[in-house]
Design a protein with these regions (language model features):
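Non-catalytic beta-sheet/beta-sandwich ligand-binding modules that flank or precede catalytic cores
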Residues: 1-155
Length: 155
């Protein structure tokens, strides 16, 4: 498994592992580990793998997770070679050598933050001297640029 720029990454329910072996991974779709050979934890809670796909020439293994990861969650992945010796029940290179088991490894979470689709809601209006103060309820910060000048208000 690689580190740095090619370290494990997750976007939504797709977790991609990259390998740096000099040869390609085994391209035979039958020669892949069981879903249970991987342990994925999201914020410390198991997130089961539902599918394993090996991209031989890209030297990647993509895990499909039961539940999509959301922005900001902490993710780790571990792999246990399910059998001893070199066999087709493991991630292998083209020469038939098994990838060694690896302990929990941090995963880069590339899942984008959810977009805010809820508009601000009018709460109240009050006159304070020569100013009209309009209050909105909003989970985030109002966009000050959108409110520059009269911003479409008529008094």
């Amino acid at each position: 498994i690689t580190t740095g720029a090619t370290s494990p990454k997750v976007t939504g329910d797709q977790l991609v592992l990259s390998f740096n072996d000099t040869s390609n991974l085994d391209a035979d779709p039958v020669h892949k580990p069981a879903n249970g050979a991987f342990t994925v934890l999201v914020n410390g809670v198991a997130n089961a793998v539902t599918n394993v796909t090996v991209q031989a020439q890209a030297k990647t293994v993509t895990l499909t997770l039961t539940t999509a990861v959301t922005h900001g969650q902490s993710v780790t992945v571990a792999y246990t070679d399910p059998t001893t010796g070199n066999d087709t029940n493991a991630i292998q290179n083209a020469a038939g050598n098994d990838v060694a088991s690896f302990a929990a490894t941090a995963v880069v979470n590339n899942t984008p933050a959810a977009t805010d689709t809820t508009p601000p809601v009018f709460s109240s209006a009050a006159v304070n001297g020569d100013q009209l103060v309009i209050t909105y309820t909003e989970a985030n910060t109002l966009d000050a640029a959108a409110l520059a000048g009269s911003a479409g208000f008529t008094v």
